[in-house]
C-alpha cells in the first residue's frame, strides 16, 4: 500500500493543506504542537475510523469551522483509489470511495491499512486492560471490517443490559424475562468477539515472539495470552459451547451484577496478558524493555496484515523512532526496508541513524503548514 496524496481541510490545525508523498520514508520535523501528530491521526482515521486522541468528531474539526475533510489517493496492489471522509462538528460522517458515497462505515474499512507506533503505545505494557483490548480490536477492524458491526451491536446490548441492572427492582417489576433476553444477546455476540480475539492472538504470538527474540538478542521469550472472563479452552471451540459457558458465567455473577448495577462478564472486561519469560511484562520497569516489547507487537501486526491482505500496510511512527537506540532502529529498518511506506514525526533529526535519512522526504511542519525542509536529502 502506498499513500500518494493527502488533503486536509479544516482538520485540527490544518486549514487547507495538500501533501504529496514522494519517497518510501517521509519524516515530518517540527516543534511540539505544530501539527505533526495531527497528520498521522488523519491517516489513522482513514485506516480505523477511530481517533485515539479524540472522544468526538467535533474535536477533529478546526475551531470555527462546521466540518472537516480528509481526502487521500492511495495505491493498493498497483491500483489507485480516491478516498474522502467528511466530519461534521454537530455529529455525523460521510465517506466516499472513488466518488461513490457509502452507507455503512464498515464498507470503508480496508481501504487503508496502517500500523501506528506512538508513545501512547507504551500503555500496552503498563496501562489498564482497556488499552490492550482497544489495540486488539483495532487490528481486527483492519483484518475483518465486519467486526465493526459486531462490536457496535455488543456495545448497544451492553448499554441496555446495564440500564436494566441499574433499575430499582420494586419500580421495574419482574426483570427476569427482560434480563434473560439481554443475557442471551450478550452471550451470542460476546462469544463471537472473544473467539475472534483469541484466534488473532494465536496468529500474532509466534510473529511477535520471533521479532522480540531478534530485537532482544534472543535473551527473552515473549508470550501473548487472552484471559477471557468466560472459560475458552480452544479459540476454535464450537460457538454453542462457548455461548453456554458464557451464560453459565453470567449466572455465577448474577448477585454481584445486581448489587453493582453493571455487567461483570464479557469481552469488555477481558484481559490480554503480555509475558516475558513467564512473568507479566508490566513488572519490567525498564523503558527499553517496554519499547522492545511494543516494537515486537507492532512488527507482528505489520507482518500479519501483510500476510492477510497481500500488501504491506503503512507504518506511522509518532515521536518514537528517535527514542529507540541504534540497534532497535536498525532492526526496524531491516524489517520494513523500502517496501513499507513509513511516515515518521520528530522534533529533531540528530538521533536518527543515517540509513533512515538516506533517500527520505523531509518535511517541515509549523503552525499547521507543511513545506519541504532544507534538510531534505536527494532521493536515492
UniProtKB/Swiss-Prot annotation:
Keywords: ATP-binding, Cytoplasm, DNA damage, DNA repair, DNA replication, DNA-binding, Nucleotide-binding, SOS response. Disulfide bonds: none annotated. It comes from the Bacteria. It holds the Pfam family SMC_N. InterPro entries: DNA-binding_RecF (IPR001238), DNA-binding_RecF_CS (IPR018078), P-loop_NTPase (IPR027417), RecF/RecN/SMC_N (IPR003395), RecF_2 (IPR042174). Coiled coil: none annotated. One of its GO terms (biological process) is DNA replication. Belongs to the RecF family. This is DNA replication and repair protein RecF.
